[in-house]
Amino acid sequence: MAKLTKRARVIREKVDATKLYDINEAVVLLQELATAKFVESVDVAVNLGIDPRKSDQNVRGATVLPHGTGRDVRVAVFTQGANAEAAIAAGAELVGMEDLAEKVKAGEMNFDVVIASPDAMRVVGMLGQILGPRGLMPNPKTGTVTPNVAEAVKNAKAGQVRYRNDKNGIIHTTIGKVTFTTEQLKENLESLVSALKKAKPAVAKGIYVKKISISTTMGAGVAIDQGSLEEAK
């Protein structure tokens, strides 16, 4: 049997895998265990009561967290004319059409989010094999294909997170950094859960939000008592 690292031993001793933690207690515990030499992210996994094999039960969208994610987000926008000027004014790092597409094809991928105006999708569509596998392909459901590119840029910069269930019906995303206050992480999580509930497929049956767990980049997952979230009350 492999020998546990000191960090793993501490996590095993401190985290009760059978317990549902109050959100405040969970955040304090994760912050105590976050001993990496970098500022760890706080990630969340939400198990949804959906059948991910059925397209009409898949959950996908985006929401702006009230306290952001703590990340500096670089935004690329495919658009032209007045929209290009508006995107630059809103803070986009890269703006263009065919010229920007050529940079992407050449491997210049120094951005975290891609936004496109509808008229630019003829250009972006040819980049599907590059952007798709990286989760960067613009999509109307996440607000990244829109005539109002300036607003989309502002949302991305303000801490918008995109979510999409995996093949097991689980949503994985981030809700901030371990340096955030307990209240900030709690409110970000509540905002995400609220958005997920609004995105509930009409055909989904039974309990929708089945389990919520939060973890740090290098830490163990801690299951959350949903009753400790305002959204659940």
UniProtKB/Swiss-Prot annotation:
Keywords (A to Z) from UniProt: Repressor, Ribonucleoprotein, Ribosomal protein, RNA-binding, rRNA-binding, Translation regulation, tRNA-binding
GO cellular component: cytosolic large ribosomal subunit
A Gene Ontology BP annotation from the UniProt entry: regulation of translation
Listed CDD domains: Ribosomal_L1 (cd00403)
GO molecular function, one term: structural constituent of ribosome
Superkingdom as given in the UniProt entry: Bacteria
Any Pfam family: Ribosomal_L1
Role this protein plays: Binds directly to 23S rRNA. The L1 stalk is quite mobile in the ribosome, and is involved in E site tRNA release.
HAMAP family to which the protein is assigned, alphabetical: Ribosomal_uL1_B (MF_01318_B)
NCBIfam families: rplA_bact
Complexes and interactors: Part of the 50S ribosomal subunit.
Protein name: Large ribosomal subunit protein uL1
Taxonomic source organism: Shewanella frigidimarina (strain NCIMB 400)
Gene name of the encoded protein: rplA
